[in-house]
Every structure is written in C-alpha cells, then in structure tokens.
C-alpha cells in the first residue's frame, strides 16, 4: 500500500538492507498489541500472505473472508486486507489476551513493523518508522532476522515483482478509470492470484504478462 509521505519526517533518516542492524526488536511485544488495533484497511495482503493463511488455518480464500479477511480499494484496485473488529477495532486474529493467533503465518506488513519499505529502481530498502511503535525500549536486531521469513532472497524477489505488477495495473487504470475497467482489473487480480492461487511461490512468471 502506497503512502504519500516525506520519509524524513517519519524515520530516523537511514535506509537499511537485510543484513543491517536496526532498533526494531520489540521483545515479543510483551503486554502490547497497539499495532493490532485501529489499522483500518491498511494491512493489505499479498497472494503469498493469503497462501500462508490458508495453510495455517486450513481454509480456502472464501473461508478466510468469514474469519478475518475483507476486500477494499487499495491504490486503485480491490485487494484483501486484515479486518478490524469491535469497538476497539482489533485485528480479527487477535485473541482476548491481546496475542496474535496467526503469528507463524502473519502477513508481510506485520512481519515488517515497525519497519517500512521504500521502493527503488532495483528492489527496495527498509526504513524505521520512529513514531508508529509504542515500545520505546526496542533492541537492535538484524533486519532479515526480524522479518523472519524462509528463503529471504526469493521472498524479496516476490515482493519486488508483486509491487511492479500492481503498479502496472494502476497505470492501466490511469488511462481508463471507468468503473467497468476497475472492476475487470480487480476481479482479474483476485481470481488469478488470490482465489485460484495460480501464484503461490516467489517465481512470478504470470506477473510479467
């Protein structure tokens, strides 16, 4: 999900690579679940996120829609996101003790936090969001250890390709922003990459079409 911001205003002014140390370790988020509340529709899910959730919960995409995933407009197209529920607008997958019930399969955005990504011509780098996390006594940790994803090189390739693919779809809609075109593009993305899970591993041949 794109954000139109000045990165200098929300970060420590540094950009990080996967092997850099960054003060992001929240020590298991002991006694805190602030970042799991009030996120609106901002926790947008990638096809790989959905694939992991389906495996973790033994559920289809349709079943996930009844458990805590919803559809909303994101950067011009309709994409799935984690739903917030109740008066406290808590993540649907947060239990009564304020702990994540899908931690092993948590979405990419959740794995990153309090880091963010800034996309460049070739790939991306990370930045530390200094005002987002309520934990003030965070420890230093290597970026790739914090994100904790298997086969990080392939995962990063997927993230870059998925970002480029969505950007291409947005450009298509800039030239034809009619409701019919927006619906056609959105349904194509949802059916191909989420419902049918044509793409479930970081080797996005279909994204290059």
Feature locations, PLM:
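Single conserved hydrophobic/aromatic residue that forms the stacking wall/gate
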Residues: 199-209
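Hydrophobic scaffolds flanking metal-cofactor catalytic centers in soluble metalloenzymes
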Residues: 2-177, 193, 197
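Alpha-helical protein-protein interaction elements
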Residues: 154-157, 185-186, 202
